[in-house]
């Protein structure tokens, strides 16, 4: 659990996870546009999220599609709920 939480401690990774929560399954190009980051940087962050078990990937032709795992959904929801309580 701690390693998964550390993976979302990075602001870019948190933004990517939130985008996947909103958009469902997205490709690197879509995530790079949302995060306003370079494709290679987004790919690096997605690898970290995948290693932590927070996202899955699948190949669709030349593109790789990413989605949150159930664990990723749960952890992100917990973090966002905690943040909302702190700012309320």
Question: What annotation goes with each model-predicted range?
Answer:
Residues 1, 21-22, 67-88:
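Amphipathic alpha-helical dimerization/coiled-coil segments
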Residues 6-12, 69-71:
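Short helix-coil-helix linker/hinge
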Residues 11, 23-27:
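Short capping segments at the starts of secondary-structure elements
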Residues 17-21, 49:
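Hydrophobic residues on short alpha-helical segments
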Residues 16, 30-32:
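A short acidic, leucine-rich amphipathic alpha-helix
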Residues 19, 34, 58:
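Residues within the alpha-helical elements of helix-turn-helix
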Residues 30, 50-60, 67:
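Beta-hairpin "wing" of winged helix-turn-helix
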Residues 38-41:
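Helix-turn-helix DNA-binding motif, specifically the short coil turn and the N-cap/start of the second
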């Amino acid at each position: 659990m701690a390693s998964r939480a550390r993976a979302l401690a990075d602001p870019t990774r948190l933004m990517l996870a939130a985008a996947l929560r909103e958009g469902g399954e997205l490709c690197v190009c879509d995530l790079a546009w949302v995060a306003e980051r370079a494709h290679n940087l987004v790919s690096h962050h997605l690898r970290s999220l995948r290693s932590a078990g927070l996202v899955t990937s699948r190949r669709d032709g030349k593109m790789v599609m990413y989605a949150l795992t159930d664990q990723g959904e749960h952890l992100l929801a917990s973090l966002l709920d905690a943040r909302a309580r702190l700012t309320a």
